[in-house]
Amino acid sequence: MMEEYVVIGKVLDTFGLEGELKVRPYAPPEVFENLEKVYLKRKGGDWVPFEVEWVDFIDDKVIIKFKGYDSIDEVEQFKGAKLFLPKEELPELGEEEYYAYELVGMEVETDKGKKLGKVERVQDMGPYDALVLDKENLLVPFVSDIVLKVDKENKKIIVKEELLPV
């Protein structure tokens, strides 16, 4: 059986002069805290492992240093790349934490019972993530003021109707 990989972040830019990378995390901090290896996908489809030398956190970004990449010139090639982990290596999350892949396919409805559609994907909007729904490409900000409940068991997300951008 083929391993399933999950995106955990995206390289935004280089950081410093010694091969560090600034990453926008798509996963909670605990995924990065003990990170030993990440995977990037080659254009041909092969998964390439990279050993992680160290990880640091600055504001809402993650700084990662790969072993053996010690200059800015060596890591320029990674700008824009997505970082992956095999699904089975992801740590268990807390009660109110979710990986983006877990939300895909969930039904979204309002607290008044109106069905809005299924989550097609989770889109990075900068300061927050948004749920892209299959009906009319509706975007629902994935923020605590709007998302009232995520029911993993019943694959349902309840959102506050009066705060929706519709």
From Swiss-Prot:
Q: Which UniProt keywords apply?
A: Chaperone, Cytoplasm, Ribosome biogenesis, rRNA processing
Q: Where in the cell is it found?
A: Cytoplasm
Q: Pfam families annotated for this entry?
A: PRC_RimM (PF24986), RimM (PF01782)
- Coarse class of the primary localization is cytoplasm
Q: Does the keyword Disulfide bond apply?
A: no
Q: Which GO terms describe its cellular component?
A: cytosol; ribosome
Q: One biological process GO term for this chain?
A: maturation of SSU-rRNA
Q: Which PANTHER family match?
A: RIBOSOME MATURATION FACTOR RIMM
Q: Know anything about its domains from the record?
A: The PRC barrel domain binds ribosomal protein uS19.
Function text: An accessory protein needed during the final step in the assembly of 30S ribosomal subunit, possibly for assembly of the head region. Essential for efficient processing of 16S rRNA. May be needed both before and after RbfA during the maturation of 16S rRNA. It has affinity for free ribosomal 30S subunits but not for 70S ribosomes.
Q: What family is it from?
A: Belongs to the RimM family.
Tell me the subunit arrangement. Binds ribosomal protein uS19.
Full protein name: Ribosome maturation factor RimM
Q: Which organism is it from?
A: Aquifex aeolicus (strain VF5)
